[in-house]
Amino acid sequence: MYINTGYLNHSHLDFKDKSRPLVVGSCGIYRLSGDPRMPTYRPKGRLDYQIIYIASGLGHFHFDKPENETIVPAGNMVLFRPKELQKYEYYGEDKTEVYWIHFTGSDVKNILRSYGLQDNQRVFPVGSSLEYEQIFKQIIQELQRCQEHYEEMLALLLRHLLIVFQRELTRVHILKNEYLDREMHSAVTYFNENYNQDISIEITPRQGA
């Protein structure tokens, strides 16, 4: 198993910080191979927010109740908010690789909304991108090296990550709308050209396919 992590002030404790709009607390990578299972269970959640990006494999998440299970595949991002139940597992057989980041701040809720991460959603289809992984690795390095103005750099890098997430979410939404528009246009054209025939609902999709 490969692990690479960085923690603000070398502290593993979760915290809430309202002194600044956005504060990164920790960030890391887990890459499972032969390890059978890596579980996390926080019944009362944490004080901060957490983003988990699944780069490969699968994540087994239990939202709201421990008995609920949602399998989240690669190419998705999971968002946990403060004090939400956090129960999830990764399995070596899935060859799972995840990137995670914990953050807090006085304006996090509005920042997330501004980048299209709605309050009632936990899983976001952000796709797979090396750019995501590069940003996570930069954040880890900043936490490990603690160079001048690194806390400000951490906040900027997190915003960068949120922006590229939003761009992909917006692109997916546009592609879906374009697909629906094309399908609707094809259906209207077919009906116009065959208005004098008996048209069965069963054959219509095949004619437009």
What do these predicted ranges mean?
Residues 108, 161-162:
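Hydrophobic-face residues of short alpha-helical interaction/recognition segments
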Residues 128-138:
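A structural motif
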Residues 119-130, 143-156, 163-208:
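Short, Lys/Arg-enriched, Trp-marked, Pro/Gly-tolerant hinge/linker segments that flank
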Residues 22-24, 72, 133, 175-177:
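Short, flexible segments with low predicted structural confidence
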Residues 48, 155-158:
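Generic structural concept
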Residues 2, 10-12, 19, 26-118, ...:
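N-terminal regulatory/effector-sensing and dimerization cores
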